Amino acid sequence: MTLLGTALRPAATRVMLLGSGELGKEVAIECQRLGVEVIAVDRYADAPAMHVAHRSHVINMLDGDALRRVVELEKPHYIVPEIEAIATDMLIQLEEEGLNVVPCARATKLTMNREGIRRLAAEELQLPTSTYRFSDSESLFREAVAAIGYPCIVKPVMSSSGKGQTFIRSAEQLAQAWEYAQQGGRAGAGRVIVEGVVKFDFEITLLTVSAVDGVHFCAPVGHRQEDGDYRESWQPQQMSPLALERAQEIARKVVLALGGYGLFGVELFVCGDEVIFSEVSPRPHDTGMVTLISQDLSEFALHVRAFLGLPVGGIRQYGPAASAVILPQLTSQNVTFDNVQNAVGADLQIRLFGKPEIDGSRRLGVALATAESVVDAIERAKHAAGQVKVQG
């Protein structure tokens, strides 16, 4: 039996978000729908989820002592990481002391580091992956590239949004690629992964829910990446029945091996009927924002339902849908959005995240659309995103 208290009362059920960006904001809103008390934590003030939380705190989430202090102050029943850059060793300690980390501290630690999740997938679970080598010095990095061959990709083992990544075509790029990887890691200079290039037809995110009533799958989400970040996503991505079956089997093995209840974003390469594991996030995925319009239960609603111990039952997908990011480039601490009236309409929505500032290029919103076909949905979403004029 799941017992939920009422927010701001003595018996409240408390959820602490570690990371309060646009994904955390939607998780907070879903918690609010169930009367759950929300505490939003991030490294900067006025982060999106803080706008819809009961309380908020600004800390360095890589500082384990600071993390412990805020947890001891708020006494959450659930700790919900939204990002990778967290003191995961402290999360493991807190979990050992009886706190509930979503989906579990081990999953958060393994997926924070590309080495942890790659070794789990390729070596323990024997899943198909790209060829790879790990290196912690420039000389070993050069040896790894020689072993993998050209072209290849180098990434810091701890980074996100394409930071520190280089597509290497020749030996002339090696020195610069190593230096860039050292600058782009979340925890500073360190270890890298060198990966062989996988030939694939498309990439998908298979949003996979591990819940009290079993493992559930959303329809596959296709997406287009640019500079390491997604630009558009769509659902459903068409693929063969055999490829879908293989994708679901890989995703099932990964989420059960990681453990815990919640939604996982399992990233896969698809080539014909073949499916290759890429990465996994133990939390809602940015490409999954399309589910805000494409499903009866968004990825955020599914995540909350799962980690609270509630059954999912089933997931209804409404048909072709797409998302397109609103990604301006400017510098401002007083952003405004003009021409919004032309970005909404029948089966056409936007979400503006409420980020407090921008300095360069930053994702500030997303357009969402449905249509008779995926192609039309993508075009509608892209057009709507382009209608929003960001000023500051």
Swiss-Prot record:
Its EC number is 6.3.1.21. It is an enzyme of class 6 (ligase). Pathway: Purine metabolism; IMP biosynthesis via de novo pathway; N(2)-formyl-N(1)-(5-phospho-D-ribosyl)glycinamide from N(1)-(5-phospho-D-ribosyl)glycinamide (formate route): step 1/1. Mg(2+) binds at E267, E279. Residues 119-308 form the ATP-grasp domain. GO terms for cellular component: cytosol. It catalyses: N(1)-(5-phospho-beta-D-ribosyl)glycinamide + formate + ATP = N(2)-formyl-N(1)-(5-phospho-beta-D-ribosyl)glycinamide + ADP + phosphate + H(+). One of its GO terms (molecular function) is phosphoribosylglycinamide formyltransferase activity. ATP binds at R114, K155, S160, S161, G162, K163, G164, Q165, E195, G196, V197, V198, E203. Keywords: ATP-binding, Ligase, Magnesium, Metal-binding, Nucleotide-binding, Purine biosynthesis. GO terms for biological process: 'de novo' IMP biosynthetic process. It comes from the Bacteria. Signal peptide: none annotated. PROSITE patterns: ATP_GRASP. N(1)-(5-phospho-beta-D-ribosyl)glycinamide binds at E22, L23, E82, D286, K355, R362, R363. HAMAP family: PurT (MF_01643). PANTHER family: FORMATE-DEPENDENT PHOSPHORIBOSYLGLYCINAMIDE FORMYLTRANSFERASE. Involved in the de novo purine biosynthesis. Catalyzes the transfer of formate to 5-phospho-ribosyl-glycinamide (GAR), producing 5-phospho-ribosyl-N-formylglycinamide (FGAR). Formate is provided by PurU via hydrolysis of 10-formyl-tetrahydrofolate. Belongs to the PurK/PurT family. Homodimer. This is Formate-dependent phosphoribosylglycinamide formyltransferase.
